[in-house]
């Protein structure tokens, strides 16, 4: 957890005029007591309760401060100090007083591609530094591209407002809905995994506007704007791009690619011929077209300031973000239900197979019982035949001569013993047959 100075910022800085404001932040000019150095004090309203939507969460503030403390680059605003009180965290930032780049360019009588690329090169250098540290700005737009001093011979670009910047961790999926609708990438609109590529899309939109004074995806409503972005619905209208080089258009085309993996990276953009090669343009008609381009840029700048509050970063889409999160949760629940349904079907199929196998075993068992019964019946028939034969032999013996009387008695005795034994065996077999018949009937009933 980051620690900030638990002191009254006004004990160290004299507060001055307000420079800008957002949904939960106010920026004021300030002067350090003792040194007279001028800075910008950004007052960020803290969120008091985790469940509240008012204010900025501690986690978000700490993330912004952590990123600002890490970065040091000529084209990125510098953090000097951080204070905290009961209601606010106060960032003491480098004072960037030259105004917005687009406002500066809109004041010029003419604008060449060479001048545009000089400023764009500074933007790319700043973004290249961020991306080298795996930091994505996620809110690159004209009002976050400032000049340190517009009166300097070669004004220096400063990238500001790291309120929604994130470190992109390898192997970790990150999704969110934020940014400014006109400049966000399709993967933000579609709630897909985000990376450094989203900044490159924003640079493509900024370049398009810089060269034409027209916004490539801006619709009559925010929803129309988002639809245009998702469909990559833009073109190079001849009215706006008649004097624009093919190299410049190619630079934009390589950035405004829906698939982030196919989008030009920051390293590739710095190596693009339009950025590397400075071309001087001559001809009588070119200055007039360049003046027309600057006039259109003025119109865009005036329109954007009149239609959108300064330093507004997709705050109005927070509800949309929550809706998309709910939709994602519902889709996840649906996928789990479908998975459960598949598992139930698989279990039913397994039970059906088990029942069929059991039925087959019962049929096989019934067939075995039938074979045993037939075998016992055969044995019974043989036993009956033996009994009949014994009776016939006894009758034959009775018909013998008187001399055989003793033998006949013995035979009769033998017959009686044998008859008793046979009767017992016959009774046993009959009992066994009845038992087997009952088992067979019970088995057939169980199968049905």
Curated annotation (Swiss-Prot):
Its EC number is 2.7.11.1. One of its GO terms (cellular component) is membrane raft. GO terms for molecular function: ATP binding; DNA-binding transcription factor binding; identical protein binding; kinase activity; leucine zipper domain binding; protein homodimerization activity; protein kinase activity; protein serine kinase activity. Residues 13-275 form the Protein kinase domain. It is an enzyme of class 2 (transferase). Residues 422-436 are annotated as: Leucine-zipper. Residues 161-204 are annotated as: Activation segment. InterPro entries: DAPK3_STKc, Kinase-like_dom_sf, Prot_kinase_dom, Protein_kinase_ATP_BS, Ser/Thr_kinase_AS. Serine/threonine kinase which is involved in the regulation of apoptosis, autophagy, transcription, translation and actin cytoskeleton reorganization. Regulates both type I (caspase-dependent) apoptotic and type II (caspase-independent) autophagic cell deaths signal, depending on the cellular setting. Involved in formation of promyelocytic leukemia protein nuclear body (PML-NB). Involved in apoptosis involving PAWR which mediates cytoplasmic relocation; in vitro phosphorylates PAWR. Regulates myosin phosphorylation in both smooth muscle and non-muscle cells. This is Death-associated protein kinase 3. The gene is Dapk3.
């Amino acid at each position: 957890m980051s620690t900030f100075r638990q002191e009254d910022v006004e004990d160290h800085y004299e507060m001055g005029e307000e420079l800008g404001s957002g949904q939960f932040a106010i920026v004021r000019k300030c002067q350090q007591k003792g040194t007279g150095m001028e800075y910008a004090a950004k007052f960020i309203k803290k969120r008091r309760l985790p469940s509240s939507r008012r204010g900025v969460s501690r986690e978000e503030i700490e993330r912004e401060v952590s990123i600002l403390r890490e970065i040091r680059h000529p084209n990125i605003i510098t953090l000097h100090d951080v204070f905290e009180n009961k209601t606010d965290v106060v960032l003491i930032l480098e004072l960037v007083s030259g105004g917005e780049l687009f406002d500066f360019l809109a004041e010029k009588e003419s604008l060449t591609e060479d001048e545009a690329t000089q400023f764009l090169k500074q933007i790319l250098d700043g973004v290249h530094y961020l991306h080298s540290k795996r930091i994505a700005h996620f809110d690159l737009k004209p009002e976050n591209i400032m000049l340190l001093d517009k009166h300097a011979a070669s004004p220096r670009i400063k990238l500001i407002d790291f309120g929604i910047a994130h470190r992109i961790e390898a192997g970790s999926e990150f999704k969110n809905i934020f940014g400014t609708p006109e400049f966000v990438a399709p993967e933000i609109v579609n709630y897909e995994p985000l990376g450094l590529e989203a900044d490159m899309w924003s640079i493509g939109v900024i370049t398009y506007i810089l060269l034409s004074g027209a916004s490539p995806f801006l619709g009559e409503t925010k929803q129309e704007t988002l639809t245009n972005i998702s469909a990559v619905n833009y073109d190079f209208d001849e009215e706006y791009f008649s004097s624009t080089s093919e190299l410049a258009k190619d630079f934009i085309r390589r950035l405004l690619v829906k698939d982030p993996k196919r989008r030009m990276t920051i390293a590739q953009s710095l190596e693009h011929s339009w950025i590397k090669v400075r071309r001087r343009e001559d001809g009588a008609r070119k200055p007039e077209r360049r003046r027309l381009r600057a006039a259109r840029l003025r119109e865009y700048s005036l329109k954007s300031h009149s239609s959108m509050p300064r330093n507004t970063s997709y705050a109005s889409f927070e509800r949309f973000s929550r809706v998309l999160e709910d939709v994602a949760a519902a889709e996840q629940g649906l996928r789990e239900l479908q998975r459960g349904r598949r598992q139930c079907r698989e279990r039913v199929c397994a039970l059906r197979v088990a029942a069929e196998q059991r039925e087959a075993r019962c049929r096989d068992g019934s067939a075995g019982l039938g074979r045993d019964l037939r075998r016992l019946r055969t044995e019974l028939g043989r036993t009956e035949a033996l009994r009949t034969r014994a009776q016939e032999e006894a009758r034959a013996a009775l018909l013998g001569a008187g001399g055989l009387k003793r033998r006949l008695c013995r035979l009769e005795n033998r017959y009686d013993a044998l008859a008793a034994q046979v009767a017992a065996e016959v009774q046993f077999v009959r009992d066994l047959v009845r038992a087997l018949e009952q088992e067979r009937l019970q088995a057939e009933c169980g199968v049905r």
